[in-house]
Amino acid sequence: MSSRRDVLAVVLVAALLPPALSRGLWLGHHGLGHGHGRWRAPHVGGHGQGQGPQQHAPLGGGGWSSAHATFYGGGDASGTMGGACGYGNLYSQGYGTNTAALSTALFNNGLSCGACFEVRCDAGGGGSHSCLPGSVVVTATNFCPPNNALPSDDGGWCNPPRAHFDMSQPVFQRIALFKAGIVPVSYRRVACQKKGGIRFTINGHSYFNLVLVTNVGGAGDVHAVAVKSERSAAWQALSRNWGQNWQSAALLDGQALSFRVTTGDGRSVVSNNAVPRGWSFGQTFSGAQFN
């Protein structure tokens, strides 16, 4: 089993005035070896619990595809906190340890953040001595960067065009033996089942509203967000800053806000007045949810 090298990444969200220049930047680095060096922000600890795959319905026809899986983050999954989707503390956000970093082929430049996948070890594909029965459902919360210094079949597991899941260690060990390190898997998209409504965390400052969208059910992968303030009758589209952080340069301070969230399957849900008057930056609010 190859040695691990965890390399911290830096998230820089810079707000520049005038508002038209406001934008966010993120930088990522990765190490060598398999299943390691994921994009990661500084993290905090905690504990959470995932959901079983039997509660999830297939999406897009439910067909299975082939990939490989490794693991990272340690036995308590503390090393999976942060990540390129911007979710931060995966425990407090409700994602728990049922998470994975996706290779370029699956990550879709961040638009796959929040998508749910059912994954099972493929004993017939060469993992007969390492596989455990059953399957798990993981949420995409991070990016597994390519490592062009290593061959795709010997350490560069996330190199394009490979489909690869770098899973948290606890969830990997539910489908395969720890000593295996890497196993062939089958996977398919499934519907995400979440408790409560979609959550909107508003960061930034006046004229730079950075809205983190989490706990999204259904397809899970947010592709568009729009906001409507109490002083406007029109919806204003937000632009994706990074991960699932969406930004607006409008002056929204103190107003009641409604949000419209659209996922990759084209479905939308509206959370009317999810944010009440008098809100403050840094607060999180709950809205409607996909059925």
Swiss-Prot record:
Recorded GO CC terms: extracellular region; membrane
Tissue expression summary: Expressed in panicles and flowers.
SMART domains (UniProt xref): DPBB_1
Induction statement: By gibberellin (GA3) and wounding.
Keywords noted in UniProt: Cell wall, Cell wall biogenesis/degradation, Disulfide bond, Membrane, Secreted, Signal
Signal peptide (UniProt feature, chain positions): 1-22
Domain Expansin-like EG45, residue spans: 82-197
SUPFAM superfamilies in UniProt: Barwin-like endoglucanases, PHL pollen allergen
Expansin-like CBD domain sequence ranges: 207-287
Residues covered by region (Disordered): 37-61
Membrane topology according to the record: Peripheral membrane protein
Compartmental location: Secreted, Cell wall; Membrane
PROSITE patterns per record: EXPANSIN_CBD, EXPANSIN_EG45
InterPro entries: Expan_Lol_pI, Expansin, Expansin/allergen_DPBB_dom, Expansin_CBD, Expansin_CBD_sf, RlpA-like_DPBB, RlpA-like_sf
Chain's role: May cause loosening and extension of plant cell walls by disrupting non-covalent bonding between cellulose microfibrils and matrix glucans. No enzymatic activity has been found. May be required for rapid internodal elongation in deepwater rice during submergence.
Family: Belongs to the expansin family. Expansin A subfamily.
The protein's name in its UniProt record: Expansin-A5
Source organism phylogeny: Eukaryota, Viridiplantae, Streptophyta, Embryophyta, Tracheophyta
Gene: EXPA5
